[in-house]
């Protein structure tokens, strides 16, 4: 994902090495893979969607596993992308889509998200609900890895999707999709990616983790500076983690962001890596996550007290990173999901 930029920047800027950290970056195929590798001890930490904190700690849709999240990498960064076929059928917004759905009752329109415990799922549902569409009964929402979204849209397997960049811009570049909305239009400044850490690692290597947070704070500030964005897009394209070109990667980093149907927008707040105190796992972020899970029936009301307590434990760890100058080693990989 484009918003893995702080990890790439930290490596390219030599921040891991200069802070005495030995960090290995690995790219995984999907969020389910990251979850499984965390549970089975194959990962110490990961660049992950915020909702995985709650899913892992409560054992939702899988075994429970204690994790903490001392750092937020980014806010926003996603978009809704629909097929060109829907555009050709007159769809311009969710209200128009509702009319089309009503006129074709023999067809079940299908939309993709990267995880049910992610902002993408919440954003997709909010956009549908804006047009009076019931996400549970009027359409089908399926989970796919982000890197397959544009491809599945082009092959007609999806009518639309919500994903992070560069997959929306890739669909636009392929002339198979267009974007009616971005994160900021639906849920402004929502937490997107977090540093997800196994609790046992956090307890055993607290100083190393505090140093790592300090490194990421510096790399996030670098990524948020407008003058660094072109270089950042180049680094991402050269990293070997992306099939997308530097041109496609730059659309949400440098801009302008092209919606695929002749409308462009500035990208100043498309990705927020450091501004607005983005890196602090604040109480309002946890509250938002709980509210979304309750609204979308991912969390039974009976589990709400436990969920509040688990999030409080997970999001209050190491919120004041400091630099530790002694040499430290992180033996297992920091993982990003492409």
Language-model region placement:
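Short glycine- and hydrophobic/aromatic-rich loop-to-beta-strand nucleating segment
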Residues: 80-81, 194-197, 201-202
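C-terminal non-catalytic accessory extensions
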Residues: 314-338
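Inter-helical turn/loop segments and adjacent helix faces that build the functional surface
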Residues: 134-139, 203-208
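Short, glycine-/small- and polar/acidic-enriched structural segments
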Residues: 1-136, 142, 159-171, 176-189
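Short gly/pro-enriched beta-turn/loop segments at secondary-structure junctions
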Residues: 189-190, 231
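Functional cores that coordinate and move charged inorganic groups
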Residues: 146-147
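Secondary-structure end/capping motifs
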Residues: 208-313
């Amino acid at each position: 994902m484009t918003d893995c930029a702080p990890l790439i920047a930290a490596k390219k800027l030599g921040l891991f090495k200069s802070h005495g950290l030995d960090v290995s970056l690995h790219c995984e195929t999907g969020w389910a893979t990251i979850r499984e590798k965390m549970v089975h001890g194959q990962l110490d930490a990961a660049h992950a969607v915020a909702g995985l904190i709650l899913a892992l700690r409560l054992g939702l849709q899988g075994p429970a596993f204690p994790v903490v999240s001392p750092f937020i990498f980014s806010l926003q960064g996603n978009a809704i992308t629909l097929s060109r076929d829907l555009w050709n059928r007159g769809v311009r917004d969710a209200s128009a889509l509702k009319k089309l759905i009503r006129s074709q009752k023999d067809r079940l329109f299908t939309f993709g998200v990267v995880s049910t415990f992610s902002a993408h799922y919440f954003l997709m549902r909010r956009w549908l609900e804006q047009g009076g569409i019931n996400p549970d009964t009027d359409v089908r929402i399926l989970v796919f890895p982000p890197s397959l979204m544009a491809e599945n849209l082009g092959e007609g397997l999806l009518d639309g999707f919500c994903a992070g960049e560069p997959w929306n811009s890739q669909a636009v570049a392929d002339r198979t999709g267009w974007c009616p909305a971005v994160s900021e239009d639906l849920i402004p400044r929502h937490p997107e990616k977090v540093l997800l850490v196994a609790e046992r690692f956090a307890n055993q290597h607290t100083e190393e983790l505090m140093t790592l947070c300090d490194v990421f704070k510096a790399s996030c500030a670098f990524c948020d500076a407008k003058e660094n964005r072109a270089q950042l897009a180049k680094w991402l394209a050269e990293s070997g983690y992306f099939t997308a070109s530097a041109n496609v990667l730059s659309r949400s980093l440098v801009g302008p962001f092209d919606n695929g149907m002749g409308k462009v927008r500035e990208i100043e707040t498309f990705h927020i890596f450091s501004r607005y105190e983005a890196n602090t796992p604040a109480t309002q972020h946890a509250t938002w996550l709980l509210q979304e899970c309750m609204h979308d029936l991912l969390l039974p009301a009976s589990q709400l007290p436990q969920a509040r307590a688990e999030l409080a434990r997970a999001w209050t760890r190491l919120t004041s990173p400091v630099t530790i100058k002694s040499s430290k080693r992180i033996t297992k990989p920091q993982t990003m999901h492409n």
